[in-house]
């Protein structure tokens, strides 16, 4: 990948198929609408009822074959979000998750990947689906810089997503080697309370829900009842703006940027695409192209 290019890893592989069905042709046919030096590195997600799933509970679904066909048409990598941290041996035989991995492994141009947390699942995927590259999930909550370094040194992972609270540790981040920097994928637009001490427990609760359990957990962070708001995320100390990417991170040698949003609506994800990828003078045109498509229900 070109290091002077910001590679965005976008949410909603299954959830926002209809949005991407409209957006991707615009991105290809009207490059003048979009910033120079940005592209789509991957789109990630998982269908509902995937017990290997984690990070967020998926509510929307779309046919996996159609999803893959769309991304192949545009040369974009598809990633399965299988970041459940609570898997045990008996879960590895799950038919739906294995069928998805087998389908994604069939397509090698471009390569597809899996976002993973569980070491048990990691070893299983390496053994059964070696065609799929692996991403270390942000659900590991890597807030310790030395732990991040060790994770980037692991040959198992092509990319590593640290906790968003390491985003502004510029001096430490700049000590990483070129190969380590190539692996780091920053989570840009997290809205979670910066001082949250329960982030790992929150992700574990999602993992348990995907396994059919009812964990006794509720978020008590300040402002949690408001839900996700992009305006609030922009005020987060860990927020990475489009200006930060262009003026700080790319010059430092970092190229990969994850945009969260799987559990949100299409309209808000569109705002992310406009903010991070679209030149301000063309944002209204892109928004109109999307809104005026009668096949897309944004709200």
Task: Show which residues each predicted segment covers.
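Active-site pocket-lining/capping segments in soluble small-molecule metabolic enzymes
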Residues: 1-147, 151, 157-299
């Amino acid at each position: 990948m070109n290091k002077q290019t910001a590679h965005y890893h976008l949410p909603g592989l299954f959830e926002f198929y209809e949005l991407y069905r409209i957006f991707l042709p615009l991105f290809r046919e009207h490059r003048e609408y979009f910033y120079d030096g940005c592209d789509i590195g991957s789109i990630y997600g998982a269908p509902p009822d995937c017990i290997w799933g984690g990070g967020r509970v998926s509510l929307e679904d779309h046919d996996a074959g159609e999803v893959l066909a769309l991304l192949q048409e545009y040369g974009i990598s598809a990633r399965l979000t299988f970041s459940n941290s609570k898997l045990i041996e008996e879960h590895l035989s799950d038919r739906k998750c294995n069928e998805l991995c087998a389908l994604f492994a069939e397509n090698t141009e471009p390569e597809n990947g899996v976002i993973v947390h569980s070491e048990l699942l990691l070893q299983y995927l390496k053994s059964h689906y070696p065609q799929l590259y692996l991403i270390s999930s942000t659900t590991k909550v890597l807030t310790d810089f030395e732990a991040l370094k060790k994770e980037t040194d692991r040959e198992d992972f092509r990319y590593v997503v640290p906790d968003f609270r390491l985003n502004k540790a510029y001096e430490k981040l700049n000590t990483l080697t070129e190969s380590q920097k190539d692996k780091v994928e920053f989570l840009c637009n997290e809205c979670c309370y910066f001082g949250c001490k329960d982030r790992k427990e929150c992700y574990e609760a999602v993992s348990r829900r995907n396994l059919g359990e009812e964990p006794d957990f509720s978020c008590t962070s300040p402002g949690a009842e408001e839900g996700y708001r992009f305006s609030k995320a922009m005020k987060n100390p860990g927020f990475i703006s489009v200006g930060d990417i262009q003026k700080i991170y790319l010059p430092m040698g970092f190229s990969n940027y994850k945009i969260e949003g799987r559990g949100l609506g299409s309209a808000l994800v569109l705002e992310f695409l406009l903010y991070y990828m679209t030149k301000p003078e063309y944002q209204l045109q892109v928004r109109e192209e999307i809104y005026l498509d009668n096949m897309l229900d944004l709200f």
